[in-house]
Amino acid sequence: MVAAMVAALRGPSRRFRPRTRALTRGTRGAASAAGGQQSFDLLVIGGGSGGLACAKEAAQLGKKVAVADYVEPSPRGTKWGLGGTCVNVGCIPKKLMHQAALLGGMIRDAHHYGWEVAQPVQHNWKTMAEAVQNHVKSLNWGHRVQLQDRKVKYFNIKASFVDEHTVRGVDKGGKATLLSAEHIVIATGGRPRYPTQVKGALEYGITSDDIFWLKESPGKTLVVGASYVALECAGFLTGIGLDTTVMMRSIPLRGFDQQMSSLVTEHMESHGTQFLKGCVPSHIKKLPTNQLQVTWEDHASGKEDTGTFDTVLWAIGRVPETRTLNLEKAGISTNPKNQKIIVDAQEATSVPHIYAIGDVAEGRPELTPTAIKAGKLLAQRLFGKSSTLMDYSNVPTTVFTPLEYGCVGLSEEEAVALHGQEHVEVYHAYYKPLEFTVADRDASQCYIKMVCMREPPQLVLGLHFLGPNAGEVTQGFALGIKCGASYAQVMQTVGIHPTCSEEVVKLHISKRSGLEPTVTGCUG
């Protein structure tokens, strides 16, 4: 199926030509409408996960819907198709490159299991990148097909507000289109932040907008930042054999449980990723060899230092894509500190018929599944007589570092701040995955903790899991926590043996007890 889609993108075969012609006609039709104004029940600005989910749901409910989407090329010139950050430069390519790194580890373990594999194995960036990029392009195509099938009008235009009901869009050829709608949803997402105070940052650095679309290996790489994007990228780059360094100004994974975050970076350090902690870059210079000389300040020593790299990747956070929307012309309020759009529980902005969902909205998790669900629920409230609001509490997530970190609910710090140390009980354990034993893999950072209320029935406030397949493990327990599970109910649950997830239902040692939290056997 993927191969067929990719083939269609490169040059459609006969069986795909009717669908291709239909899509092309739709685009030409949108462009030719520049002279007149087109009206819709719903206009969605932004073709990412949340916006597409909202548009498709509204169309399913029989409404006339349009999507306006435009990708501003990165400073490096990277651009991509329909689908937003997740599909093109986020979750999907990131997880696939993470998988490439995991496969490298499995190949190195293979001889322990009887496979005669010549060592050392070599990784080919070009092969991986082409496969990942082709899959992404197939998803771009799939989104176009879905919009066509649901009769959603797609406009490849850069949209900005004229007034609270009207948007002006300009295509890549400079042709303008006017669109109006009874309801407008802003779902433009965000883009990586550049440290503009660092000389050479824009000219010589790249971001997550670029790394997945590189045709050649990035080589020796400096990743600047301590976000999950920084650690995930550094993790898979190290995993495929590249010399990788992470430069962090302060703590890793701000907003996550800090004990778990420290274990994540400890594991990465012990498996080859180098860390420059408490350091801030000051400037980048391109050398005659085409390498990049980076100068930074070490805050601990107060001294300057330099290093040479092939690639510098900025991963210092993201900014909402609101700069060119002309929000003020529609009277839409934003947070002046971060430029995110202020919304209420209904996802409504300061203008009642204009809404914002996903990463562009203030106070919302920057996660694809929340944007998708919020978009669907919004369409159902607008057009399907529903009153169900999006519940943003206890949203699970996973950081796809080499040793994955999955979590749901409160961190230990948040629980203590909210309820007080004396009212919080934390159950925890180190464990060794069965798969690690034969290959004698290091499992010193495989760790689980469950944050609970101390008083009966000991409501589970949060679960934190560090180990293989953390996303798969956390997803199931997220349902229990969402439903108000207690510690006793988790302990009454029978585990599936032998799995890592069964260690969660065996947690019996509390931090308060002071006992050693180490699992001593696989069947105990």
From Swiss-Prot:
Highest taxon listed in the record's lineage: Eukaryota
UniProt-recorded Gene Ontology molecular function terms:
flavin adenine dinucleotide binding; protein homodimerization activity; thioredoxin-disulfide reductase (NADPH) activity
Give the Pfam families listed for this entry: Pyr_redox_2, Pyr_redox_dim
Which residues does the Swiss-Prot or TrEMBL record annotate as the active site? Answer: H497
- Where N6-succinyllysine occurs, the residues are K79, K175, K329
- Alphabetical keyword list: Disulfide bond, FAD, Flavoprotein, Mitochondrion, NADP, Oxidoreductase, Redox-active center, Selenocysteine, Transit peptide
Q: Which GO terms describe its cellular component?
A: mitochondrion
* Similarity remark: Belongs to the class-I pyridine nucleotide-disulfide oxidoreductase family.
Other known facts: The active site is a redox-active disulfide bond. The selenocysteine residue is also essential for catalytic activity.
What does this gene product do? Involved in the control of reactive oxygen species levels and the regulation of mitochondrial redox homeostasis. Maintains thioredoxin in a reduced state. May play a role in redox-regulated cell signaling.
In Swiss-Prot or TrEMBL terms, this protein is called Thioredoxin reductase 2, mitochondrial
Native source species: Mus musculus
Gene that specifies this protein: Txnrd2
